[in-house]
């Protein structure tokens, strides 16, 4: 499997009967959430027992050019009638979803091994499960409570984003999100309701609101819409995601933020996205920004690793080093602050589900401190939106300009970096990569 040669992150655990790790617990939550919807999730592990990838059982993705041959190969016997071929669902031009129910090889990994040997690697792949959780994704930690009057950090920039539309595909928007001034006017599909200190905060409720808050702080007058797509313990199958993204393109966004992703079988690109780019290229100017994952590895994390995507890693709290949890490598385009950010969150009681705080209960009052490349990505998405409104560039042009700036101010041993508006130790406002002030980052009296 693809994980044989990866550099593993510090939180990954095995399936050898030892105390559950963060990843083990998140896998169980995702498997249970999909099972409630009648969908079985397969768990592929590396030879050492660590997680390799998650996938939807009983279906595979197949390139259309090979579909007739693969479908015939999967018949239970050579004498099966044509009507007994596995059922097919067209997904996007170039790729189809093929059911393995009743086929010769009903289990995904077994079927793919046989297809690889017969037709070649990459003809068919699993429909991988992508996630906003620490299962090869983000955030890197569970949220920490902060006082109710805590201000967002990074705080709002000076204007920016006027006339720009940011689309956030995530877990949804909290009903009371616009109680926070920087989120006023943000729209979207609602997260499960909370609102009183005693009410439980479910799963990754609040993740989408936090992401939207970070983006809005960088582009305070942008139009932001949050779609509740990752509603199964913060996870979604790749073939469902590309359908949602296709619908999003029809709304005409300038920037799409995707704070989710995953690793794949044999580290191959997500097959559904390979064909999605054919649709994407017809929508001039829109840019997709995605988080690079929190596994502290250089293993490709998809879809951030695609060249068509702005893949965002996280800087540490001091903003001068890579965050310990952030993925890295040549496929990461830029690093931005993602450690200890503060923004809008749910109100209610949160029970920790991951080590080292399993079972502890904390009460949140509409704000939280959270870490992960999940939150570095919307910071960059917001900077792109702010630049669009300032320069008249479209999304892809603005992203290209900012990435050039990021390379020019790279940190040795880290890579290209972007910073938000901030203040120096002297209290002066320093320059921001969104362009709200001129000069290089760090221009102040310090």
PLM segments and residue spans:
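Protease zymogen maturation seam
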Residues: 2, 89-99, 103-165, 177-180, ...
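Inhibitory N-terminal propeptides of secreted protease zymogens
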Residues: 14-126, 132
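Glycine-centered tight turns that cap/initiate beta-strands
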Residues: 120, 285, 308-311
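Active-site core segment of subtilase-fold serine proteases
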Residues: 141-223, 243-251, 349-353, 357-365, ...
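Extracellular S/T/G-rich loop segment that most often corresponds to the catalytic His/Ser-adjacent loop
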Residues: 170-172, 301-389
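Short helix-loop-beta-strand segments that form the rim/entrance of peptidase-like active sites
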Residues: 215-236, 240, 393-409
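Substrate-binding/access-modulating region of protease and related hydrolase catalytic domains
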Residues: 230-306, 363-378, 445
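C-terminal subdomain of the subtilisin-like protease fold in secreted/lumenal serine endopeptidases
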Residues: 249, 253-261, 267, 271, ...
């Amino acid at each position: 499997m693809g994980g044989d040669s990866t550099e593993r992150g510090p939180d990954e655990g095995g399936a050898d009967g030892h105390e559950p790790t963060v990843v083990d617990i998140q896998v169980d939550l995702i498997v249970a959430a999909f099972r409630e919807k009648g969908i079985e999730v397969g768990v592929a592990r590396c030879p050492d027992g660590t997680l390799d990838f998650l996938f939807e059982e009983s279906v595979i993705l197949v390139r259309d050019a090979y579909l007739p041959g693969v479908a015939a190969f999967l018949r239970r016997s050579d004498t099966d009638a044509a009507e007994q071929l596995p059922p097919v669902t067209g997904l996007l031009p170039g790729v189809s979803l093929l059911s393995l129910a009743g086929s010769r090889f009903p289990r995904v990994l077994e079927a793919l091994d046989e297809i690889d040997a017969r037709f070649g690697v990459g003809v068919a792949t699993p429909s991988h499960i992508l996630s906003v959780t620490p299962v090869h994704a983000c955030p890197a930690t569970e949220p920490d409570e902060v006082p109710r009057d805590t201000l967002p950090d990074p705080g709002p920039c000076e204007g920016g984003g006027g006339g720009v539309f940011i689309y956030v595909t995530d877990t949804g928007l909290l009903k009371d999100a616009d109680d926070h001034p920087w989120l006023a006017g943000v729209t979207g599909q609602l997260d499960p309701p909370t609102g009183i200190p005693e009410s439980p905060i479910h799963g990754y409720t609040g993740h989408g609101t936090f992401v939207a808050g970070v983006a809005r702080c960088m582009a305070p007058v942008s139009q932001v819409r949050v779609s509740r797509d990752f509603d199964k313990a913060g996870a979604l199958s790749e073939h469902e995601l590309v359908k949602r993204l296709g619908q999003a393109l029809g709304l005409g966004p300038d920037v799409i933020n995707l704070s989710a992703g995953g690793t794949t079988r044999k580290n191959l690109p997500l097959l559904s996205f390979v064909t999605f780019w054919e649709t994407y290229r017809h929508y001039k100017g829109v840019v997709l920004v995605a988080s690079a994952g929190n596994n502290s590895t250089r293993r490709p994390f998809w879809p951030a690793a695609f060249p068509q995507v702005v893949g965002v890693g996280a800087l540490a709290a001091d903003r001068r080093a890579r965050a310990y949890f952030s993925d890295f490598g040549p496929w990461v385009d830029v690093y931005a602050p993602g450690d200890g950010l503060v923004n809008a969150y749910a109100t209610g009681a949160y029970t920790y589900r991951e080590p080292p705080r399993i079972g502890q209960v904390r009460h949140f009052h509409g704000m939280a401190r959270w870490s992960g490349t999940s939150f570095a990505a919307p910071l960059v998405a917001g900077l792109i939106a702010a630049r669009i409104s300032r320069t008249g560039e479209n999304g892809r042009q603005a992203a290209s300009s900012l990435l050039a700036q990021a390379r020019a101010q790279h940190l040795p041993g880290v890579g290209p970096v972007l910073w938000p508006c901030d203040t120096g130790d002297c209290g002066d406002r320093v320059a921001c990569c969104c362009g709200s002030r001129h000069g290089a980052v760090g221009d102040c009296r310090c």
